[in-house]
Every structure is written in structure tokens, then in C-alpha cells.
A protein has these predicted regions:
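RNA-binding accessory domains that recognize and position tRNA/RNA substrates
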Residues: 1-184, 194-212
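Conserved G/P- and acidic residue-centered "switch" motifs that form tight phosphate/ATP-binding loops
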Residues: 190
Length: 212
């Protein structure tokens, strides 16, 4: 299964009120900087309160994920399969294929979590949950629905395109570097000063280091 995009989840940035866009813009800049030396072409952008990394053409998946895992401000990284909207019948086939390729065991519990941002889509979120859940049960009878603690949580987001994702890779959290001023870090040669530097950088402080 080829993942075409990454959905970036953030934490504290989401409670910043009217200044939220400043923190989102800083996160986008930091992601672009982290990916500048990674093989591949990437389009990092915001859309409807989300941050996405769209992968144009071939790219190094492992290197991309490792680079994103080092960006402060990212709470989770979701590899996304991005689909053209070719009708609901095609979506059912795509969901069946996604489960078949990503989860070869086909005996786990699952839950569908649909989100319909494009209100013109003919089915609402609850109808998508029910219909797509039925598709998986028909295709893979050993799988069971568990709405409370599923092993697989398949997210289906209906936008101009359709996004499928089920994995959340943990990020470092914190705030994007540069959103909370700057400071000088004295590196004395012990372990405590780099640890302190990491922790303060995680709070969004841009650091300059000095040695003696």
C-alpha cells in the first residue's frame, strides 16, 4: 500500500484561539525545513484546521517519517491513502483493499470513524460508518466491530478527495521551535545541559549554544 500524504496532528496549538494560525504557520515552516534534505518532493499545507504533507511522486517513506518524528509541535503522524472521489461503490472497493493490504491477518476488531467535511457528499458520517463497516464484515468475516477499544480505527475523511488512514505514529509533542522566543544554552560537557536544551526547545524556544 502506497501512502500519498501524511496528516499531521498537533496538540497545544489547537487551543491558541485567535493566534492559532501563527503557530500553525510556524509548524508548517518547521516541517518544510525538516524535509528539505529528504528524497522526494513534498507539499506542506494547511486545510480546514489540519496540516498535511502531500508526497509528490516517489519518496523515501522511512526517512520521511523519521524526519517528521523530530519536529516539535507534532503529536501524531498519520500515513494517508489519498483517493479521488469516484463514487461510493468505488470507495467501498478502496476500503476493502486498504484493510486487505495493510492488515493481512484480517482477524482484528475494528471501528470506522468517518468525517464528512464536504457536505454535498450523498451520505452523512453515520451512514458512512454503517455502510463501510458492513463492507469490511462481508469481505473479512473473522473481523469484528468494537466501538470502544478497537484494534483498528479506520478514519475516512471526505473532502474534495477522500483520505483513508488508520495508524498514528507518535511525534515529540511540544510547540514549534521559534514560537516562544530565543535563549542561549551553555553546554558544559555533561548530560544535563543537552537534556535541558532539548526540553526547553520542545517548548518552542529557539536556542543558540555556547561552549567553554
Amino acid at each position: 500500500m502506497r501512502f500519498h500524504s501524511f496528516l499531521i496532528k498537533y496538540g497545544e496549538i489547537g487551543i491558541k484561539g485567535k493566534n492559532r494560525y501563527l503557530f500553525e504557520d510556524a509548524l508548517v515552516r518547521q516541517i518544510r525545513f525538516a524535509l528539505k534534505d529528504v528524497d522526494g518532493e513534498f507539499n506542506v499545507h494547511k486545510a480546514q484546521g489540519r496540516v498535511y504533507v502531500d508526497c509528490e511522486g516517489e519518496y523515501d517513506y522511512e526517512e520521511t517519517v523519521e524526519s517528521l518524528k523530530r519536529v516539535f509541535g507534532i503529536v501524531g503522524i498519520c500515513p494517508v491513502v489519498r483517493l479521488q472521489d469516484n463514487g461510493f461503490e468505488q470507495l467501498k472497493k478502496d476500503v476493502e483493499k486498504y484493510i486487505g493490504e495493510v492488515y493481512p491477518e484480517k482477524n482484528q476488531t475494528f471501528k470506522i470513524e468517518a468525517r464528512r467535511s464536504r457536505k454535498s457528499y450523498p451520505l452523512n458520517s453515520m451512514e458512512l460508518n454503517c455502510e463501510l463497516g458492513g463492507v469490511i464484515l462481508d469481505a473479512y468475516p473473522e473481523m469484528k466491530v468494537d466501538v470502544h477499544n478497537p484494534q483498528i480505527r479506520l478514519n475516512v475523511e471526505v473532502r474534495e478527495e477522500i483520505y483513508l488512514y488508520s495508524e498514528i505514529i507518535p511525534g515529540p509533542g511540544g510547540m514549534p521551535v521559534g514560537t516562544n522566543g530565543s535563549a542561549m544554552l551553555l553546554l558544559s560537557g555533561g548530560i544535563d545541559s543537552p537534556v535541558a536544551g532539548y526540553m526547553i526547545a520542545k517548548r518552542g524556544v529557539a536556542l543558540e549554544a555556547t561552549y567553554f
